[in-house]
């Protein structure tokens, strides 16, 4: 899975967000998608399907370590999930089992580049290949609703097209319910499966709605 390119999504998927203006931010304007907006996007003739990114509503921190190499990092994190059908890894790996306390994770490939060519180089630490990343232990600490729990993270793939840390939908639904039961997850990003990515109607619709795509793959 590590050398197969993008573990996240196929070419006919577009990630849609709302344009954020400085004025809108100060005015407290929401950049999340309403149910009506999602329904309207689903109804467009160029759309095959729409899935919402679900954000984590609880605090997450992670420690990364490889004892043999003397590597130990710790950082705050933010998880997102999308429905399973949009994830391009074998589903036997993309499964959360509460009993094992192991969370499968897809990370942006540029995180690995950032570590190898920035952090590792400046501190004379060993560089890591994608294959080696499967040996890296992640200690995930989750906090919320008066609970603090520790899980293990297992990196199962990398994405070029996604700048977020992706976890299975089943895990996210369970975790938000247990660690943030009073909150409702509102998507600020949508994953749109289109019939033809070169269809100009997509660009027209996005401009009219003031939406944009991550990576500007409609330009």
Model regions and ranges:
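Alpha-helical transmembrane helix bundles of large polytopic membrane transport and channel proteins
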Residues: 65-72, 76, 84-99
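Basic-flanked hydrophobic alpha-helices used for secretion and membrane insertion
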Residues: 33, 49, 58-62, 87-90, ...
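Conserved short beta-strand edge segments in small beta-sheet-based binding/regulatory domains
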Residues: 212-218
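Short hydrophobic beta-strand that contains or immediately precedes a catalytic carboxylate
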Residues: 76-80, 105-107
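Pocket-edge structural micro-motifs
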Residues: 17-18, 81, 109, 215
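Membrane-proximal extracellular/periplasmic loop immediately following the first transmembrane helix
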Residues: 2-76
């Amino acid at each position: 899975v590590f050398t197969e390119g993008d573990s996240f999504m196929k070419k006919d998927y577009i990630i849609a967000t709302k344009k954020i203006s400085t004025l809108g931010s100060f005015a407290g304007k929401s950049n999340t998608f309403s149910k009506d907006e999602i329904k309207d996007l689903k109804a467009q003739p160029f759309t095959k399907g729409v899935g919402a990114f679900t954000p984590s509503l609880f605090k997450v921190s992670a420690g990364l370590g490889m004892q043999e190499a003397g590597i130990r990092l710790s950082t705050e994190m933010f998880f997102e999930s999308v429905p399973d059908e949009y994830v391009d890894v074998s589903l036997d790996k993309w499964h959360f089992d509460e009993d094992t306390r192991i969370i499968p994770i897809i990370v942006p490939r540029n995180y690995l580049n950032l570590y190898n060519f920035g952090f590792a180089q400046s501190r004379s630490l060993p560089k890591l290949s994608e294959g080696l990343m499967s040996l890296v232990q992640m200690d995930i600490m989750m906090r919320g609703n008066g609970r603090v729990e520790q899980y293990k993270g297992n990196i199962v793939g990398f994405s070029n097209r996604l700048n977020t840390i992706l976890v299975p939908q089943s895990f996210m639904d369970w975790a938000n319910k247990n660690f943030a039961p009073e909150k409702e997850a509102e998507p600020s990003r949508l994953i749109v499966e289109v019939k033809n990515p070169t269809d100009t109607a997509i660009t027209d619709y996005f401009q009219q709605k003031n939406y944009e795509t991550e990576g500007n793959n409609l330009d």
